[in-house]
Amino acid sequence: MYQDLIHNELNEAAETLANFLKDDANIHAIQRAAVLLADSFKAGGKVLSCGNGGSHCDAMHFAEELTGRYRENRPGYPAIAISDVSHISCVSNDFGYDYIFSRYVEAVGREGDVLLGISTSGNSGNVIKAIAAAREKGMKVITLTGKDGGKMAGTADIEIRVPHFGYADRIQEIHIKVIHILIQLIEKEMVK
């Protein structure tokens, strides 16, 4: 009944991944991002992650697997997803939704930390403000974006961009794979 739809969806996902893999810069960016994060942890830093909607869930997933575990037991790594509901509702009410991430970065970010900003469009105003706040703090910035990178293009130390201009879910599918690879590489770097 739905076999054609299922095949089409999986083929489109495979095509998106194949297009991402065609650009060696993506592979190098993932490696550089993992080393940057591990170096921050080794120096006593932490990572703050943020995004909206599905990207918010990806930011939480990233932090959870760093503080908890990925595939193997190991010490937890210092990662915080900016996802505290009381913080988000307070800042949204008192300052506006565009400031929910930047206020948190201003409060707990410090030089040597890393911000991971996730946006499939690259145009999330609150993530862009978080990047600016991270820069003010002397933090490094990694972004996971899609399409042409949007307004976030060129704002990060390392941008990992999925060049897909269709639905956001295709971009998110690559983002979660990148997140898992980052964690795997961080684990390898941390035991060097």
Curated annotation (Swiss-Prot):
Pathway where it operates: Carbohydrate biosynthesis; D-glycero-D-manno-heptose 7-phosphate biosynthesis; D-glycero-alpha-D-manno-heptose 7-phosphate and D-glycero-beta-D-manno-heptose 7-phosphate from sedoheptulose 7-phosphate: step 1/1
Coiled-coil ranges per UniProt: none
One GO cellular component term noted in the UniProt record for this chain: cytoplasm
GO biological process: carbohydrate metabolic process; D-glycero-D-manno-heptose 7-phosphate biosynthetic process
SUPFAM superfamilies: SIS domain
List of residues binding substrate: N52, G53, G54, E65, N93, D94, S119, T120, S121, S124, Q172
Record domain SIS: where: 37-192
EC number: 5.3.1.28
Cofactor info, note text: Binds 1 zinc ion per subunit.
InterPro entries, alphabetized: GmhA/DiaA, Phosphoheptose_Isoase, SIS_dom, SIS_dom_sf, SIS_GmhA/DiaA_subfam
Molecular functions per Gene Ontology: carbohydrate derivative binding; D-sedoheptulose 7-phosphate isomerase activity; zinc ion binding
Listed cofactors: Zn(2+)
UniProtKB keywords: Carbohydrate metabolism, Cytoplasm, Isomerase, Metal-binding, Zinc
Predominant localisation class: cytoplasm
Reactions listed under catalytic activity: 2 D-sedoheptulose 7-phosphate = D-glycero-alpha-D-manno-heptose 7-phosphate + D-glycero-beta-D-manno-heptose 7-phosphate
Annotated binding of Zn(2+), by residue: H61, E65, Q172, H180
Classification via Pfam families: SIS_2
UniProt cross-references to HAMAP family, sorted A to Z: GmhA
Extra information: The reaction produces a racemic mixture of D-glycero-alpha-D-manno-heptose 7-phosphate and D-glycero-beta-D-manno-heptose 7-phosphate.
Function in brief: Catalyzes the isomerization of sedoheptulose 7-phosphate in D-glycero-D-manno-heptose 7-phosphate.
Subunit composition and interactions: Homotetramer.
Family, similarity comment: Belongs to the SIS family. GmhA subfamily.
PANTHER family linked: PHOSPHOHEPTOSE ISOMERASE (PTHR30390:SF7), SEDOHEPTULOSE 7-PHOSPHATE ISOMERASE / DNAA INITIATOR-ASSOCIATING FACTOR FOR REPLICATION INITIATION (PTHR30390)
Name recorded for this polypeptide: Phosphoheptose isomerase
UniProt source species: Salmonella dublin (strain CT_02021853)
